[in-house]
Amino acid sequence: MRALPLTIGTIHFVGIGGIGMSGIAEVLHNLGYAVQGSDISDNQNVRRLREAGIQVMIGHDAANLGTAQVVVISSAVGRDNPEVAAARAKLIPVVRRAEMLAELMRLKWAVAVGGTHGKTTTTSLIAAVLEAAQLDPTVINGGIINAYGTNTRLGAGEWMVVEADESDGSFLRLPAVIAVVTNMDPEHLDHWGTAEAMEAGYQQFVSNIPFYGFAVLCIDHPTVQKMIPQLSDHRIITYGFSPQADVRAERINTDKFGATFEVVITDRQTRRTRRTPPLRLPMLGEHNIANTLAAIAVAVEMGISDSVLQSAFASFKGVKRRFTKTGETGGITIIDDYGHHPVEIAAVLRAARQAGARDVIAVVQPHRYSRLASLFNEFCTCMNDAGTVIVADVYNAGESPIEGVDRDSLVDGLRTSGHKSVVPLPGPEHLAEMIHAIARPGDFVVCLGAGNITAWAQTLPEELATLQAKSSKIRRTGSGG
């Protein structure tokens, strides 16, 4: 891997504990650069970086800069941050996270994966395929890849796979050779302003690929399909379940452990088709089959064999917080999932049904007041696959409250939209007792959100088991008396 000039000095990351920032910091550290950083609080990413030998300071203070010669910030870091202000006062370059990622991407041939949903899993699947093909890729992902125990991988090969962040438009800076778009639903409109502006951003993202590159687009998504005529000067490959898709899944058989399917691949120029042998994916949900099709589209163009695909997918270990089982007690399964957009929530709850749940109990922690406000009607209608919905307070993620947009308004909205069983969660300390009162053997409890609900999902199995043991003891005592 060609190096950046070694004279750039120590690189300081403000907000290094974020998933995107931590990945770039770890890759630069593994390349031999002096890396340090700060974050407002300790978390798993901070601990992982420290274990790797990276100094991380808790809290933001001008003194944290030390001898840093470059400062990297995310879009969440404001100009009034004391470290950023100190860097500018010292005339130290301050670069955005996406700019630093773009510099790393220039050292390789890059695949960038964009979309409202499915980016992290699709990035992980492409990485798994390239690794199985012995292409030794470098990977920078937006979630922890279970096979790595981290969200990054430094490879010696010529290819890099990255998750492209559309939230602040910074994915337009990324110099990708292959651009993947999984879907486009209204999201991050606080940055884009309108859905039309967001769609134009995605079109620019794809248009940025060079003439020797190509775009991989999900034709099943109407907004993505609408973009195709505007890309006539670029090479594209479509995927999905539609008969119009160049890479199409057929003969799908699902069970509670995953899916087996075949893929029909059509050459856009010759219209010749071929069929792959059966592929096994140990993941639930039609949306994950779609993510796999995106990886197959990339692999086909890179000349990777079907046998490599079979091996890569069959051994795929998934991504942290993507339908992750945290425990099972008394026949009740606890699932932790990052889903926080209505489309994601609906897909995860469908997957729980597919897994053979007797019933599904959704525990939802809305993430950001602005998201709940802009997608309120969608939130009120996306949970029909849950027999019961438990709604927690909004995780504000630094936002100020919006009047009339809160836990209780969502509870009322779900009920008004026809959901038969919706209850507010007074606080996380009451979750286990509520689940104990509602859940029965065979049920799935699915904890959904991008906030601290993941911590609740981790402790819930043990808390629930304790309550079950107490109830069992009381029943035995009662029957014996």
Swiss-Prot record:
<comment type="function">
    <text>Cell wall formation.</text>
</comment>
<dbReference type="InterPro" id="IPR000713">
    <property type="entry name" value="Mur_ligase_N"/>
</dbReference>
<keyword id="KW-0573">Peptidoglycan synthesis</keyword>
<keyword id="KW-0131">Cell cycle</keyword>
<dbReference type="GO" id="GO:0005524">
    <property type="term" value="F:ATP binding"/>
</dbReference>
<dbReference type="Pfam" id="PF08245">
    <property type="entry name" value="Mur_ligase_M"/>
</dbReference>
<keyword id="KW-0067">ATP-binding</keyword>
<dbReference type="InterPro" id="IPR005758">
    <property type="entry name" value="UDP-N-AcMur_Ala_ligase_MurC"/>
</dbReference>
<dbReference type="GO" id="GO:0008763">
    <property type="term" value="F:UDP-N-acetylmuramate-L-alanine ligase activity"/>
</dbReference>
<dbReference type="GO" id="GO:0071555">
    <property type="term" value="P:cell wall organization"/>
</dbReference>
<keyword id="KW-0133">Cell shape</keyword>
<dbReference type="GO" id="GO:0051301">
    <property type="term" value="P:cell division"/>
</dbReference>
<comment type="similarity">
    <text>Belongs to the MurCDEF family.</text>
</comment>
<dbReference type="GO" id="GO:0005737">
    <property type="term" value="C:cytoplasm"/>
</dbReference>
<dbReference type="Pfam" id="PF02875">
    <property type="entry name" value="Mur_ligase_C"/>
</dbReference>
<protein>
    <recommendedName>
        <fullName>UDP-N-acetylmuramate--L-alanine ligase</fullName>
        <ecNumber>6.3.2.8</ecNumber>
    </recommendedName>
</protein>
<dbReference type="GO" id="GO:0008360">
    <property type="term" value="P:regulation of cell shape"/>
</dbReference>
<keyword id="KW-0961">Cell wall biogenesis/degradation</keyword>
<dbReference type="GO" id="GO:0009252">
    <property type="term" value="P:peptidoglycan biosynthetic process"/>
</dbReference>
<keyword id="KW-0547">Nucleotide-binding</keyword>
<dbReference type="InterPro" id="IPR036565">
    <property type="entry name" value="Mur-like_cat_sf"/>
</dbReference>
<keyword id="KW-0132">Cell division</keyword>
<dbReference type="InterPro" id="IPR050061">
    <property type="entry name" value="MurCDEF_pg_biosynth"/>
</dbReference>
<comment type="pathway">
    <text>Cell wall biogenesis; peptidoglycan biosynthesis.</text>
</comment>
<feature type="binding site">
    <location>
        <begin position="115"/>
        <end position="121"/>
    </location>
    <ligand>
        <name>ATP</name>
    </ligand>
</feature>
<keyword id="KW-0436">Ligase</keyword>
<dbReference type="InterPro" id="IPR013221">
    <property type="entry name" value="Mur_ligase_cen"/>
</dbReference>
<dbReference type="InterPro" id="IPR004101">
    <property type="entry name" value="Mur_ligase_C"/>
</dbReference>
<dbReference type="InterPro" id="IPR036615">
    <property type="entry name" value="Mur_ligase_C_dom_sf"/>
</dbReference>
<keyword id="KW-0963">Cytoplasm</keyword>
<dbReference type="Pfam" id="PF01225">
    <property type="entry name" value="Mur_ligase"/>
</dbReference>
